[in-house]
């Protein structure tokens, strides 16, 4: 279960409590007690001037504003891309850890989060090109790319079109590696107009459905009600899925001998089956994590973070 403590958009000092994730058997009273004790005893860390104020920034590409958060100041660079219908907060439990020894950018995809909602060409190829141009505008020549779900397909497309920009790929529950995809989930997510309608679809993202609480559903509905969002989601979906299957596969990209690829999957993924990971050639480093679902980077954040850090340092 996820209990938000910080308000959306609130600026907090390093080390402050954003929220609490617990097992479903933990009572509300126990959570309240923990939060109260933490807040009473919390002393903000002293941070250097350059580390203060992690804030949303924007880069403009062909008339589109893409929002991103930058953390870390290492010489090496990583880029995090979320999936369909998500936003950069999908990396809430990952970005700061991954940024301990490098500079890490987490983007809102075009049409998502705080990025421009009306994007013209909504094909994966066009979205991937916009993200590549964004990184080049930020004067990044090469990066370690991390993609979740549709974000993984975008990483594969970028690697296919601009291999010199991709030092490595980490693909988490990635699209683009098989035919099967849960189309009823995608359509239900786009078309749901209330918490009651949306909840059963969002629950498919997690193995622990107690993580799907009222606040999460309200935040998703607020996003979906923004002018232009439903249209852009439908447009992206139409280019992403065809005849009940994924419209494109990029398995040949990960199978190249010179590709550095890490694949992570939740064994209980109900959106993109873990069999896609099992079907990959044996030389690709693959980890299928038991008891976790499609949002494995949130449900098993510590384990996923360690796998990525170890992969980068290998």
Task: For each feature predicted by the language model, list its residue ranges.
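Mobile cofactor-carrier "swinging-arm" domains
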Residues: 1-54
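Acidic catalytic loop of the alpha/beta-hydrolase fold
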Residues: 267-272
């Amino acid at each position: 279960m996820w209990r938000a403590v910080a308000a959306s958009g609130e600026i907090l000092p390093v080390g402050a409590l954003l929220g609490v994730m617990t097992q479903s058997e933990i009572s509300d009273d126990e959570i309240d007690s923990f939060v109260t004790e933490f807040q009473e005893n919390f002393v903000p860390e002293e941070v250097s001037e350059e580390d203060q104020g992690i804030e949303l920034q924007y880069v403009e590409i062909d008339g589109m504003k893409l929002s991103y958060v930058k953390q870390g100041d290492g010489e090496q660079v990583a880029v995090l891309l979320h999936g369909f219908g998500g936003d950069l907060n999908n990396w809430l439990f990952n970005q700061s850890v991954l940024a301990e020894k490098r500079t890490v950018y987490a983007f809102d995809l075009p049409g998502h989060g705080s990025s421009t909602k009306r994007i013209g060409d909504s094909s994966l190829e066009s979205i991937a090109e916009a993200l590549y141009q964004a990184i080049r505008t930020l004067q990044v020549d090469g990066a370690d790319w991390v993609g979740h779900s549709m974000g993984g397909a975008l990483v594969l497309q970028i690697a296919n079109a601009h291999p010199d920009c991709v030092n490595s790929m980490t693909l988490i529950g990635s699209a683009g590696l098989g035919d099967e995809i849960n189309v009823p989930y995608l359509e239900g997510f786009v078309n749901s107009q209330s918490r009651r309608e949306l909840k059963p679809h969002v629950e498919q993202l997690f193995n622990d459905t107690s993580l799907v609480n009222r606040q999460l559903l309200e935040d998703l509905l607020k996003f979906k009600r923004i002018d232009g969002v439903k249209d852009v989601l439908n447009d992206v979906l139409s280019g992403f899925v065809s005849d009940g299957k994924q419209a494109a596969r990029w398995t040949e990209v990960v199978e190249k001998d010179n590709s550095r690829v890490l694949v992570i999957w939740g064994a209980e993924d109900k959106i993109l089956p873990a069999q896609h990971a099992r079907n990959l050639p044996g030389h690709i480093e693959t980890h299928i994590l038991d008891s976790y679902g499609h949002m494995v980077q949130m449900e098993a954040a510590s384990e996923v973070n360690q796998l990525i850090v170890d992969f980068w340092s290998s």
